[in-house]
Amino acid sequence: MSAGNGTPWDATWNITVQWLAVDIACRTLMFLKLMATYSAAFLPVVIGLDRQAAVLNPLGSRSGVRKLLGAAWGLSFLLAFPQLFLFHTVHCAGPVPFTQCVTKGSFKAQWQETTYNLFTFCCLFLLPLTAMAICYSRIVLSVSRPQTRKGSHAPAGEFALPRSFDNCPRVRLRALRLALLILLTFILCWTPYYLLGMWYWFSPTMLTEVPPSLSHILFLLGLLNAPLDPLLYGAFTLGCRRGHQELSIDSSKEGSGRMLQEEIHAFRQLEVQKTVTSRRAGETKGISITSI
């Protein structure tokens, strides 16, 4: 969405420098840009909530994912809606007429603009980061929790798991790596952009010292987080499938070895029984001959 709605307009705006479109286009662009940014921040949270539900409640219904997606898009729309009223075109008269799309005059005091920017920062960065940290922490704790080995002593109503699947360190390690990668990707993609933004908020004079292209590059880096998450999950899923295949092979080998040992043990017991029976028969025959 951000690539289709915001990036081409931004590229054209950077070429023309001033705003050449109408006022409604200015408001719409800034609304769509912020909505795309909100959705890029909220969708990884939805993925984290879905993964948490899949791990903690694997037999539960997955119908809640669509509701979470709808809530993420609806919340993105509502939080970006003020952009339609804050941004507008401003005309500067002079030897060279100039028009720009800005928020000049929308805030009566500097603290109001700073408060709005901090609120946006919390909704776009701090809250999603906290939510994902909680989700993936619960996933890691659930997967890393030591499982009671179930076998002949398993309580009634519980299934006995093969030993190759019980306490598998590879599954726990993959889950831990995935959680760390998701959080690290979100932090690396968005932190530079928001650090630069906070620098602007508390020191507006820095706007003249930092090239505008830097903020655009950092913004695109932040939006890169959205397509990276599905790639990480895809790589993790392929790794899990390979791991499950290896575990299946190991368990089948273990089962075959166990069956072979049981057959050897049964064969040895049969041989012992035959030997004992033949000895007893010989002793009985010897006693009968002696008595004669």
Swiss-Prot record:
Please list the GO biological process terms of this entry.
cellular response to hormone stimulus; G protein-coupled receptor signaling pathway
Gene from which the chain derives: GNRHR2
Q: What are this entry's molecular-function GO terms? A: gonadotropin-releasing hormone receptor activity
Q: List the disulfide bonds.
A: 26-101
**InterPro entries attached to this UniProt entry:** GPCR_Rhodpsn (IPR000276), GPCR_Rhodpsn_7TM (IPR017452), GphnRH_fam_rcpt (IPR001658)
Q: What is this protein called?
A: Putative gonadotropin-releasing hormone II receptor
Tell me the Gene3D superfamilies matching this sequence. Rhodopsin 7-helix transmembrane proteins (1.20.1070.10)
Give the record's family classification: Belongs to the G-protein coupled receptor 1 family.
Stretches assigned to the Extracellular side: 1-28, 89-115, 199-216
Q: What job does the chain carry out?
A: Putative receptor for gonadotropin releasing hormone II (GnRH II) which is most probably non-functional.
- The regions listed as transmembrane in this protein's record are 29-49, 68-88, 116-136, 178-198, 217-237
The entry's comment on post-translational modification says:
Phosphorylated on the C-terminal cytoplasmic tail.
Matching entries from PANTHER family are given as:
GONADOTROPIN-RELEASING HORMONE II RECEPTOR-RELATED, NEUROPEPTIDE RECEPTOR-RELATED G-PROTEIN COUPLED RECEPTOR
**One Gene Ontology cellular component annotation held by this UniProt entry:** plasma membrane
